[in-house]
Design a protein with these regions (language model features):
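Alpha/beta-hydrolase active-site loop
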Residues: 120-145, 240
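Short beta-strand element of the alpha/beta-hydrolase
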Residues: 61-74
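Primarily recognizes the serine-hydrolase "nucleophile elbow" in alpha/beta-hydrolase
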Residues: 138-211
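Bacterial Sec-dependent N-terminal signal peptides
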Residues: 1-25
Length: 318
């Protein structure tokens, strides 16, 4: 049964108060750290956080997925173990989910001008991160028994640059592009969670050759860093959640879309304050495999707006 919800949520979210949108607290230590790739410029590692002791790791007899996370930072900064993610990692593990947080190369580090006009530079940075995500995925699949991961039950998630990467990655997977050669043949992710993400296309409107995995998107309608709607020039386009959801709706894909009215890029760091939305998506759309379609407009005066970096000028200096 398909259920589509159209609503405006005015209460129920906590304030987003940390500089990067995440509330910092006591560090959570990974249960294991592994090098998954050796590049010319650096070694790439991933941290594994197992479900908390005593937590429920199944739902109605079905195993909960592993959440594979990519940090934010505009492709110029950020780390897989940033303290700002502690609370969210702990929330997920206490709810029975395994979390894997990965490194990726920062393809825009050192760039002094970044935007759609510098599309080749941006494209390279995005696909460099996608390449590292696919390498991490291959490592996880190849070592699934050791890591305790079901290869068919991996949900990719990201914040800001990480969200762009996971959305782009699923786009590449669904279109079987050359970037996916690292992945096992026929591999599919079980779901996607994007906190202020987008997709870069050189072929006009975003088109999926295969039906995308269940996808959850959260995006501020006033986001000026990762544009909420789109930036387009002929066939070149950078499409945010506000535009992508129209494609998902038109073609009947499985999605949850949360539009944060008047919010900027702080939604990229809203993971620990939107946990209930995530758990509902993971439990219903991913684990139970139901096509629960939700499109919601959220406006909560108690959620502080304007936290963290809000523009390209602030982040890149141009």
């Amino acid at each position: 049964m398909i259920k589509k919800t159209l609503l405006i949520i005015t209460v129920g979210l906590l304030a987003i108060c940390a500089a990067n949108g995440q509330t910092k607290e006591t560090p959570i230590e990974p249960d294991g750290t592994y090098m998954f790739e050796k590049r010319d410029t650096c070694d790439l590692f991933l941290d594994v956080y197992n479900p908390a002791k005593g937590s429920k790791t199944t739902l109605n007899g079905k195993k909960k997925p592993t959440v594979l996370f990519m940090f934010g930072g505009g492709f110029i900064r950020g780390t897989r173990d940033d303290a700002g993610y502690n609370k969210w990692f702990r929330q997920l593990t206490e709810n029975g989910y395994r979390v894997i947080s990965i490194d990726y190369r920062l393809g825009l580090k050192g760039s002094n001008k970044v935007g759609i006009a510098q599309v080749n530079v941006l494209d390279k940075a995005i696909h460099m991160a996608v390449e590292d995500l696919f390498s991490a995925t291959r490592f996880i699949v190849d070592n699934a028994d050791v890591l305790g991961v079901d290869p068919a039950n991996i949900v990719i998630s990201g914040s800001s640059a990480g969200a762009i990467t996971v959305m782009q990655a699923e786009y590449e997977v669904c279109n079987r592009t050359s970037w996916t050669q690292t992945l096992p043949e026929g591999f599919r992710y079980a779901g996607v969670m994007s906190f202020a993400g987008a997709i870069l296309s050189r072929k006009g409107e975003v088109k999926y050759g295969l039906t995308p995995a269940p996808t959850m998107m959260l995006h501020g309608t006033a986001d000026n860093l990762v544009n909420y709607k789109q930036i387009k020039f002929f066939n070149l386009g950078f499409f945010g959640g506000g535009k992508l959801v129209k494609r998902f709706d038109k073609f009947g894909y499985n999605f949850n879309m949360y539009h944060f009215l008047g919010y900027g890029h702080e939604i990229a760091g809203s993971m620990d304050t939107t946990l209930d939305l995530q758990l509902k998506f993971l439990e219903t759309n991913v684990i139970e495999g139901k096509k629960r379609i939700v499109e919601a407009w959220i406006d909560d005066p108690n959620v502080y707006k304007g936290t963290g970096v809000q523009s390209r000028k602030e982040l890149y200096g141009n």
